[in-house]
Every structure is written in structure tokens, then in C-alpha cells.
């Protein structure tokens, strides 16, 4: 009968584990780099948001906010909301900026997007029904991390959307008082 607690076997197992983990992390890093998911600077007209975040956010706003007259009346309503989100992030802490960019990066990277959202293609090309289903799946997930991701994502999108004047008329808000 072999001794499974020998030091020789433990070292071998440790080396195998280390080699396997190194290969896995190296492959994930290479995939992220080749897929354009490596950290990059802000988009040309943005202070925090990256170029890869913009189409993703443009697709998520209608799914998060729901049907809104401003989406059909004002062709640049979503762009204005994205700009508002960028301004809000600009004045938040570096930690918050980093966490938001990590969340958006995770949703942009094909390796993580499919298993986490159920949408295997590009999120910017997904139908509103697919995006709503993904958001509901996160909201009702048994995993706390996905529920927190849902809550954070929706709070950010709602905060940015309802801070823009084009959203006010539909909810009966006349705007801030003139002083």
C-alpha cells in the first residue's frame, strides 16, 4: 500500500498545481490581451470610460431604464447619459472607478461574458430581451457577487440616466429650480 502523505508526493502535487495554475493564468492573460480587454486609457472624449465600454453601455441603458420616450425622440439621449455617467465616475474615488471598469471589462471580455451573462455574442449586438434576461438572471442569482453586480450596474445606469434633462419630462420632473 502506498503512502499518500509522503513529502515526495506532496512536492510533486504542489509542482503540478503550480504549473497548471501558471498555464491557466497565462492563457487567460493572453486571451484578455489578444481580445482587446487589456486595460487602456479613457476614450477620446471621456475622463474614465474606455472605448470598449461605450457600445456596451449604449446597449445596457435601454434594458436597465426600460422603454422611455427619450430613446425614440432624442437620438443622442443614450450618448448624453453615457457622458453623464463618465462625469459621475470622474468625481468618484479611484477605487470605485477601478471596480466599475473591472465590471465593464468583465462584461466586455468573451471569456467571462458568456458564462456570466448567458449571452455568448457581443453584448452590444444582443436584443433588449436578451439583455433584460441577463439582468434578471443576475438579480435573482444565488451568488451574492452577481446580485451585487446587478445592483451596482443598475444604480450606476439609473443615476446617470435620471441626472440627464431628457429623462425628466416623462417622470413629471420640471427640473431644478432657477435661482
Regions inferred by a protein language model and the residue ranges of each:
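Short, functional C-terminal segments
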Residues: 2, 163-179
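A short, amphipathic alpha-helical segment
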Residues: 2-3, 158
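N-terminal secretory signal peptides and thylakoid transit peptides that target proteins
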Residues: 3-25
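C-terminal segment of N-terminal export signals and the immediately downstream linker at the start
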Residues: 7-8, 28-70
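Short, well-ordered alpha-helical packing segments
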Residues: 18-19, 31, 135
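Short linear motifs in low-complexity, proline-biased tails and propeptides
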Residues: 23-28, 163-165
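Glycine-rich, flexible loop/turn motifs
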Residues: 45, 119, 167-169
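Flexible, low-complexity segments enriched for small/polar residues
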Residues: 50, 54-163
Amino acid at each position: 500500500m502506498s503512502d499518500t502523505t509522503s513529502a515526495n508526493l506532496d512536492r510533486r502535487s504542489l509542482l503540478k498545481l503550480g504549473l497548471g495554475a501558471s498555464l491557466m493564468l497565462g492563457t487567460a492573460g493572453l486571451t484578455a490581451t489578444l481580445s482587446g480587454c487589456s486595460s487602456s486609457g479613457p476614450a477620446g472624449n471621456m475622463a474614465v470610460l474606455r472605448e470598449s465600454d461605450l457600445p456596451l453601455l449604449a446597449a445596457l441603458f435601454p434594458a436597465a431604464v426600460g422603454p422611455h420616450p427619450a430613446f425614440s425622440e432624442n437620438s443622442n439621449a443614450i450618448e448624453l447619459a453615457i457622458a453623464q455617467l463618465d462625469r459621475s465616475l470622474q468625481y468618484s474615488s479611484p477605487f470605485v472607478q477601478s471596480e466599475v471598469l473591472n465590471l465593464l471589462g468583465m462584461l466586455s471580455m468573451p471569456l467571462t461574458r458568456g458564462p456570466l451573462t448567458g449571452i455568448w455574442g457581443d453584448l452590444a449586438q444582443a436584443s433588449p430581451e436578451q439583455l433584460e434576461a441577463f439582468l434578471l438572471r443576475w438579480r435573482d442569482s444565488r451568488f451574492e457577487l452577481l446580485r451585487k453586480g446587478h445592483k451596482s450596474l443598475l444604480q450606476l445606469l439609473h443615476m446617470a440616466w435620471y441626472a440627464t434633462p431628457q429623462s425628466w419630462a416623462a417622470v413629471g420632473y420640471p427640473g431644478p429650480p432657477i435661482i
